[in-house]
C-alpha cells in the first residue's frame, strides 16, 4: 500500500509461493515476500522496511506523521505470534487437526484487540483523528484475524475496531493494491 500511495515506480511480479522463481531466491534466499530490488541492487525483503522506505521517498498523504512504531511493533510481534497460532494451529501443535484453530491464542490476541478497540472508541484512528501509517501497517493483520471465524468476529466486543477495519478494507487504495495480477515466471520480461 505504501508503494502504491508513494507513487514509486516498480515492477509487480505475482508468484505462487510454493513455486518460487529462481530469480526471487537468488535475490532473497529466505524465500518470503516481498522481495524488492532497488536500482542500486540493495534488496528489501521485509514488508515494514519496504513500506517505510517507500514513504520516505514520497509521503503524499502524510502517513508518517504521528506514526507509532511501538504500536506497530506490538502488532508485528505479540499479535502476529498469536494470530499465526490461532489461525494455523496445526503448524504449531502436532496434535491439532488441519484447519483447527487454537482458542488459547485467540484469547491472548483478544487482549491486544481490546486495547485497539479502546483507542478507536476515543479517536477515528489508532493514534488520533488522522489516518497514518500505524493504521495502514496494522489493519491487514486485523483483517486476517477477522477472517478466521467471521461469525465470532461479528459478535466480538470490538465494534469500533470492526468499523475501522471495514473503512480500511473498503478504501480505494486497498482495493487498488488487491487487484489480481497475472502470474509471473522467470521466462518473462518486465510486466
Annotate each language-model stretch with its function.
Residues 1-103:
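GST-like domain detector, emphasizing the conserved glutathione-binding G-site
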Residues 71-170:
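GST-like fold's C-terminal all-alpha helical module
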Residues 26, 170, 179:
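Phosphate-coordinating loops and pocket residues in cytosolic domains that bind phosphorylated ligands
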Amino acid at each position: 500500500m505504501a508503494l502504491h500511495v508513494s507513487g514509486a515506480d516498480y515492477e509487480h511480479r505475482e508468484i505462487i509461493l510454493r513455486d518460487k522463481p529462481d530469480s526471487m531466491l537468488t535475490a532473497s534466499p529466505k524465500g518470503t515476500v516481498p522481495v524488492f530490488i532497488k536500482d542500486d541492487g540493495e534488496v528489501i525483503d521485509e514488508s515494514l522496511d519496504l513500506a517505510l522506505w517507500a514513504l520516505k521517498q514520497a509521503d503524499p498523504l502524510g502517513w508518517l506523521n504521528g506514526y507509532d512504531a511501538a504500536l506497530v511493533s506490538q502488532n508485528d510481534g505479540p499479535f502476529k505470534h498469536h494470530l499465526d497460532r490461532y489461525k494455523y494451529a496445526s503448524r504449531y501443535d502436532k496434535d491439532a487437526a488441519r484447519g483447527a484453530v487454537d482458542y488459547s491464542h485467540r484469547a491472548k490476541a483478544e487482549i491486544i484487540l481490546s486495547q485497539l478497540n479502546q483507542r478507536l472508541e476515543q479517536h477515528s484512528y489508532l493514534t488520533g483523528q488522522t489516518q497514518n501509517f500505524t493504521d495502514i501497517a496494522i489493519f491487514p493483520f486485523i483483517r486476517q484475524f477477522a477472517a478466521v471465524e467471521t461469525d465470532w468476529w461479528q459478535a466480538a466486543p470490538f465494534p469500533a475496531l470492526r468499523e475501522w477495519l471495514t473503512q480500511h478494507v473498503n478504501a480505494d487504495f486497498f482495493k487498488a493494491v488487491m487487484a489480481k495480477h497475472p502470474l509471473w515466471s522467470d521466462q518473462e520480461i518486465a510486466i
